[in-house]
Amino acid sequence: MPKRHHHTESRLNNLSVNADPEHPVYREATTEIQKRLRYMVDKHSQVFVGHLEFRFPPEMETQNNNRHISNAIRKCRMKLKREGIDAQLVWAREQRNSDQPHYHCYPICDGNKVQHVQRVAGFFNEIWSREIDASPESNYVRYCPPQEQADSNTGIRIRRHGSDAETQLHNASHWMSYAAKVNEKEKTPEGCRMFGFTQIPKA
């Protein structure tokens, strides 16, 4: 994603985003997030969106690349596929004052197969723990429920034929656009990606 333009309005591509003049988001990243959200909503009668945070052990020295998260996301996608769960994954790297980055990941899942994010978080925590050589009990992956519009307080569910489908679509776009915020990416090393997205299958 070579071009990065700031977006400061509360809507983009006819969907709600969490942005204003003091809290811009990257337009290109937000658009990629929305593409994956719309793809899943068009494909499945129900879509469940969760939010996971990946961190490193405080004593671990991290490199100026995204090798660990890239490996983990690839393995997480494979795990979900083996479990029969269709999903698109979005991740963002953040690093402001800390010596270590942390990552936000939004799994956009077939809501007929995923009822709450804890199951997905468990898969991801096991994979991340192996990737960073940590104990799964350390829980360096945790889920972050939305403040509002939560389904069982763990994520956002969009039911295609539900009376609140359009509202929940906007809620999900607004929630996920947090990953595209400009703030807290100041220490991203030059040449290091800030975002990652699983590929949408070609029609």
Predicted regions span which residues?
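Signature for HUH/AEP ssDNA processing cores
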Residues: K35-Q95
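Histidine-centered divalent-metal-coordination microenvironment in nucleic-acid enzymes
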Residues: V90-K113
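Residue-level signal for well-ordered alpha-helical segments
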Residues: A29-T31, R82, C105
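Catalytic "initiation/cleavage/transfer" segments centered on a nucleophilic residue
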Residues: M1-Q46, T62, G111-A203
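A general alpha-helical scaffold signature found inside nucleotide-binding enzyme cores
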Residues: N71, Y106, R119-F123
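Glycine- and acidic-residue-rich phosphate-binding/metal-coordinating active-site segment common to enzymes
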Residues: I85, E94-S98, A121-N125
